[in-house]
A protein has these predicted regions:
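Glycine-rich phosphate-binding loop of ATP-dependent small-molecule kinases
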Residues: 1-247
Length: 247
């Protein structure tokens, strides 16, 4: 098995030369992976801003097709309203259409897709069929189960200003009230411990095998997600720049 690129704790794009190198590269197709709570949303925003590439998630694609009333959206709506999962082939068709848009020429960031091995294999085949196309770089953000539990179950938000706190990691100044509004903080229904464990079981059953699929590639990056968000971002950018320079 090919050893993945690992980004050590504290890894940063420490010099102006390194910063210039990642700014100048063409990022190509990127995949961001990780369990619920690892911070994919935060990192996705940073990557989009740094490289000017679109963020593509299946949730956004489904909403877009439903709002536009497309045939794919109608099929997906019918299935979801019946409590059924949207099949891989339907999701793949939505992704294929999105990747044809001109804003993906320099690259794009996939988030939440592929979620199954079948989707990963379809994506591999599609990318392999593109003449002179850049290969996919897969980035896996790693956070311990215990830390994820604290991040998710400790999360509280202000219903007035939507400011987010964490009772373990970033508590409010006063007990369970917003620092700005003075409003009592609330916990989302899907942030309770029982729901967290169920989400992690689903992730382990469906998505963890996708991580292992890409781990066998020489273009797999593993990042310590327990570092400060800025250091995680710096590690991702440096690793992608290094791998693209070797392509």
């Amino acid at each position: 098995m090919v050893k993945p690129v690992q980004v050590a704790e504290g890894s940063q794009t420490g010099s102006s030369t390194e910063e210039t190198s990642w700014k100048e590269i063409i990022p190509g197709p990127l995949l961001l992976m990780g369990a619920p709570g690892v911070g994919k949303g935060t990192q996705a925003k940073g990557i989009m801003a740094a490289w000017g590439i679109p963020h593509i998630s299946t949730g956004d694609l489904l909403r877009d097709h439903r709002e536009r009333g497309t045939p794919l959206g109608a099929k997906a709506t019918q299935l979801m309203d019946a409590g059924k999962l949207v099949p891989d082939d339907l999701v793949n068709q939505m992704v294929a259409e999105r990747l044809e848009r001109p804003d993906t020429i320099r690259g794009y960031l996939l988030d939440g897709y592929p979620r199954t091995l079948a989707q990963a294999e379809w994506l591999d085949s599609r990318l392999a069929a593109i003449p002179e196309g850049l290969p996919l770089i897969a980035v896996s953000i790693q956070v311990s189960y215990t830390q994820l539990l604290r991040r998710i179950t400790g999360r509280r938000n202000c219903p007035t200003c939507q400011r987010i706190y964490n009772v373990y990691l970033q508590p409010p100044k006063f007990d369970m009230v917003c620092d700005v509004e003075g409003t009592p903080l609330v916990q989302r229904a899907d942030d309770v411990e029982s729901v967290f464990h169920e989400r992690m079981r689903t992730y382990a059953a469906l998505t963890a095998p996708v991580v292992e699929h890409y781990r066998a590639s020489s273009r797999f990056v593993e990042v310590d997600g327990e570092q400060p968000a800025g250091e995680v971002m710096a590690g991702i950018m440096a690793a992608v720049a290094r791998l693209r320079s070797e392509t």
